[in-house]
């Protein structure tokens, strides 16, 4: 069984021209391109939680991405230790030490994992999920919109590092970014439906029915096909499999597999979401100890020994008036999740980057899901958050229609030029790309000018 990474994963769509005395490895170049991109800088003006108010403490998408990168590099380091191989050795009935020697070389470098974590949110539009839903609704007959798909599009096409290949990142970096290796209009049937509300005033359409599916845009299929060229036909077919068979025409499907690098990035993102977003919500008073009791009860019913032993003390520190005690609790929780990570075998892939993933044990994953659910129920679905997101939805839907009514007059010069040059089928995508790249404040400022 081959467990070596093929050098083809370091290739780029356009071969880099060598620069004098530049000895950086490929993934360090990727990291630099992402860090120096306008899209990455824009994350500082996109809020992670919208209802926390004007408080210097709260996280933006940028600080969130930096924290995800730190957690991601810590997960990679943990995956090198022998205890991370225990479950895999049992799963494969092989010697743990031999597996450790064989598989450590598959792990991403710090440059690579940080590249993925820095880039994972750069395609997300203003106003969080509200903005995503609004753009998906406005693009419903033209391929839809989804934040992760926009990230891939930005990296491979939009960011002006090259004329037509975006940042021109390595194949392995792009593979690690793809969380859902399928096409959006395949995973979701919503783009084919013609519902009566399509002729209604878009400001009052129930946007909850237009949360996007998961996949890449059909416009970006050529780059996706280039990305998957190193895979065998069998691996390509397996990689695009869904978790379930569609039982209802309206059902949104999710793919089953992701690369090793992507599994590490996604786990780091989940930990940051479940723990650090909770910290923000506690500090600014969005959640209190009384609301936490339901989560505390669920946590005490989890079979995790560490949680059983420490959750009462963790709870006391989380809701303490002493900031250092809260930070101590947050650090303990993050450490608990990081040190629990382990290798797992995904399926019978020929490609080793797809054959293995990072995973939490079931009892630890259950704990993380409780944290994530609490943040979702009491922070994301908080009425103040939802009102802000709804306002964002209305702003983006109205602004989209305004731009579409007279694009050559109202779009910025370069965007208007791209709109003129685009095919009839792609003109809406040009407007969508422009709006998806806005920060919250910029979107509001432009809207007020119209």
Swiss-Prot record:
Belongs to the dGTPase family. Type 2 subfamily. The lineage of its organism: Bacteria, Pseudomonadati, Pseudomonadota, Gammaproteobacteria, Pasteurellales. This is Deoxyguanosinetriphosphate triphosphohydrolase-like protein. GO terms for biological process: dGTP catabolic process. It comes from Pasteurella multocida (strain Pm70). The keyword Flavoprotein does not apply. The keyword Hydrolase applies. It holds the Pfam family HD_assoc. One of its GO terms (molecular function) is dGTPase activity.
């Amino acid at each position: 069984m081959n467990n070596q990474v093929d050098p083809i994963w370091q290739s780029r769509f356009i071969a880099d021209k060598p620069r004098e005395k530049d000895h950086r490895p490929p993934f360090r170049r990727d990291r630099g391109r992402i860090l120096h991109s306008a899209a990455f800088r824009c994350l500082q003006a996109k809020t992670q939680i919208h209802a926390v108010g004007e408080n210097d403490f709260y996280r933006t998408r940028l600080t969130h991405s930096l924290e995800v990168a730190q957690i991601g590099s810590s997960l990679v380091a943990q995956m090198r230790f022998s205890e991370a191989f225990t479950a895999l050795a049992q799963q494969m009935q092989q010697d743990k030490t031999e597996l450790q020697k064989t598989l450590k070389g598959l792990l991403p470098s710090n440059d690579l994992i940080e590249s993925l974590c820095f880039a994972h949110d750069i395609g997300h539009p203003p106003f969080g999920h509200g903005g995503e839903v609004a753009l998906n609704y406005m693009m419903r007959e033209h391929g839809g919109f989804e934040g992760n798909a926009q990230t891939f599009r930005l990296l491979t096409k939009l960011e002006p590092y090259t004329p037509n290949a975006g940042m021109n990142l390595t194949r392995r970096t792009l593979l690690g970014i793809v969380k859902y290796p399928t096409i959006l209009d395949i995973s979701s049937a919503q783009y084919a439906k013609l519902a009566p509300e399509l002729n209604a005033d878009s400001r009052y359409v129930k946007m909850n029915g237009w949360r996007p599916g998961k996949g890449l845009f059909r416009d970006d299929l050529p780059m996706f096909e280039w990305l998957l060229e190193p895979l065998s036909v069998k691996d390509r077919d397996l990689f695009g499999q869904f978790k379930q068979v569609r039982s209802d025409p309206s059902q949104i499907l999710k793919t089953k597999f992701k690369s090793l690098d992507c599994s590490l990035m996604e786990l780091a993102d989940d930990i940051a979401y479940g723990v650090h977003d909770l910290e923000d919500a506690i500090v600014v008073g969005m959640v209190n100890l009384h609301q936490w009791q339901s989560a505390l009860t669920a946590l005490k019913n989890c079979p995790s020994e560490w949680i059983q032993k420490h959750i009462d003390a963790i709870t006391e520190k989380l809701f303490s008036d002493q900031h250092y005690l809260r930070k101590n609790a947050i650090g303990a929780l993050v450490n608990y999740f990081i040190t629990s990570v382990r290798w797992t075998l995904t399926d019978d892939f020929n490609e080793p980057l797809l054959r293995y993933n990072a995973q939490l044990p079931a009892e630890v994953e259950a704990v993380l899901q409780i944290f994530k659910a609490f943040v979702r129920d009491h922070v994301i679905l908080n009425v103040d958050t939802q009102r802000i997101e709804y306002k964002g939805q209305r702003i983006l839907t109205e602004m989209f229609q305004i731009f579409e009514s007279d694009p050559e007059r109202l779009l910025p010069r370069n965007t208007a030029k791209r709109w003129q040059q685009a095919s009839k089928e792609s003109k809406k995508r040009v407007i969508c790309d422009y709006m998806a790249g806005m920060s919250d404040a910029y979107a509001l400022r432009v809207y007020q000018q119209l």
